[in-house]
Design a protein with these regions (language model features):
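N-terminal glycine-rich, Lys/His-bearing helix-loop that initiates the first secondary-structure elements
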Residues: 1-68, 181, 404-405, 409-414
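PLP-dependent enzyme catalytic core of the Aspartate aminotransferase-like
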Residues: 2-4, 286-287, 350-414
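A non-catalytic, amphipathic alpha-helix used as a structural packing/dimerization or gating element
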Residues: 12, 64, 68, 154, ...
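Short acidic (Asp/Glu) and glycine-rich catalytic loops that position anionic groups and cofactors
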Residues: 13-19, 45-51, 160, 242-247, ...
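Flexible, glycine/charged-enriched surface loops at secondary-structure junctions
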Residues: 20, 52, 81, 256-259, ...
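Conserved PLP-enzyme active-site core in the AAT-like
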Residues: 68, 73-299, 316, 360
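A glycine-rich phosphate-binding loop feature that marks nucleotide/adenosyl-phosphate handling sites
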Residues: 266, 283-289, 305-313, 344-349, ...
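Conserved PLP-binding catalytic core of the aspartate aminotransferase-like
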Residues: 301-367
């Protein structure tokens, strides 16, 4: 059967990706090899359990790919235990909580409005209905510095079982040692949700939290890691913690793992083990810095004062008088995709906030360097300053399309 409606939608999305530039920090392009594994016959197989201990027969090759994924992840992140079965980042976090906490236990995580993630305790989420979340914030949103003194006082007062690092809209590097120190002081697990920066860690562009003593890390396998959409939980060295996590994932919260996705994870982790991936990770940072320079020159306020990672959060409403939703829409019209985003202590509503969030993982995959990212940043600001001028938008759209044609999405990275 040829499903023309679905085929046309896929073809349209392929054209959109090919002719435009992707600046959403959590998005990236995967290789043809990853896509082939994702679309392979592994999708047909049920594999409840773990390698060597399955509840169904016929597991010879599924065990091979899961073992490959686990061993490659251990090499990438320098740890002893890995579970590659989580379906994505949010399930991985819930499974981590279920493994280490009892209902009502406390977690200390980053406030959503200061860069945290929904799964770090926002009241609308399931974890917040089961566990007690308390929050830390930035001392000064213009520098991005976390108030570690206040964080320590909150930890001493609230006695969390988990001290949680990690973010979805924070552009600076956290003080790993401070997190671990605070966790140790109150007898908590030190956990890092590295979903956004996993590829930067794997590529050795930034420090590995395990080297600072974190106990567990959760992550997605897409974003900067450039794999399929999925999740993973990594344990530094404690076998008892790893055993609890395995039981929490299966049978605790999941049934049969998606073996096609695990096969694709194994391929992506193999790609990330190559020297080329380290070069890629470093270039992500260089490209983000190049964009920071342009926004600073144009006096557009950036949360944290700039970036130390792959993303930038810009206050376009305060600096340019354009709301985040307006900016997202007009930039989409010229072929630049990013997302509207609330900023620290934003007075506007989440669907029409003051900020935009953008980053460099996907354009770096297309082999953009500093010069190209500088030009894209200039075009972004030019478009926002002239958002009601059709000729400006047409000219920018033509230049973006030409850039996309000059730097096509690669089929292979190694």
């Amino acid at each position: 059967m040829h499903d023309e409606a679905v085929f046309n939608a896929i073809a349209g999305e392929e054209k959109r990706q090919r002719e435009g530039l992707e600046l959403i920090p959590s998005e990236n392009y995967v290789s043809r090899a990853v896509r082939e594994a994702l679309g392979s016959v592994m999708t047909n197989k049920y594999s409840e359990g773990y390698p060597g201990a399955r509840y169904y027969g016929g597991q010879t090759y599924t065990d091979v790919v899961e073992d490959l994924a686990r061993e490659r992840a251990k090499q990438l992140f320098n740890c002893q235990f890995v579970n590659v079965q989580p379906l994505s980042g949010a399930p991985a976090n819930l499974e981590l909580y279920a493994a280490l906490l009892n209902p009502g236990d406390t977690v200390l995580g980053m406030d959503l409005s200061h860069g945290g993630h929904l799964t770090h305790g926002h009241p609308v989420t399931l974890p917040a209905k089961i566990y007690n979340f308390v929050r830390y914030k930035m001392k000064n949103p213009d520098t991005g510095e976390i108030d570690y003194d206040e964080m320590r006082e909150v930890a001493k007062r609230e006695k969390p079982k988990i001290v949680l690092a990690g973010f979805s809209a924070y552009s600076r590097e956290l003080d790993y040692d401070a997190f671990v120190s605070i966790a140790r002081e109150v007898g908590a697990f030190a956990v890092f949700d590295i979903a956004h920066i996993a590829g930067l860690i794997a590529g050795k562009a930034i420090r590995n939290p395990f080297d600072a003593g974190f106990d567990v890390m959760t992550t997605t396998t897409h974003k900067t890691l450039r794999g399929p959409r999925g999740g993973m939980i990594l344990t530094r060295e404690d076998a008892d913690i790893a055993k609890k996590i395995d039981k929490s994932v299966f049978p605790g919260l999941q049934g049969g793992p998606h073996m096609n996705v695990i096969a694709a994870k194994a391929v992506a982790f193999g790609e990330a083990l190559t020297p080329a991936f380290g070069t890629y990770a470093m270039q992500i940072l260089k490209n983000a810095k190049a964009m920071e320079v342009v926004f600073a020159k144009e006096k557009v306020r950036m949360l944290g004062g700039g970036t130390s990672n792959h993303l930038i959060l810009a206050d376009v409403f305060g600096s340019l008088g354009v709301t985040g939703a307006e900016a997202e829409k007009v930039l989409d019209e010229v072929g630049i995709t990013l997302n509207k985003n609330s900023i620290a202590d934003d007075t506007r509503k989440p669907m029409d906030p003051s900020g935009i969030r953008f980053g460099t993982p996907a354009v770096t995959t297309r082999n953009f360097k500093e010069a190209e990212c500088t030009r894209v940043a200039e075009l972004m600001i030019h478009t926002l300053k002239h958002k009601d001028e059709e000729k400006v938008k047409l000219d920018v759209r033509a230049e973006i399309k030409a850039l996309a044609e000059k730097f096509p999405i690669p089929e292979s990275f190694v």
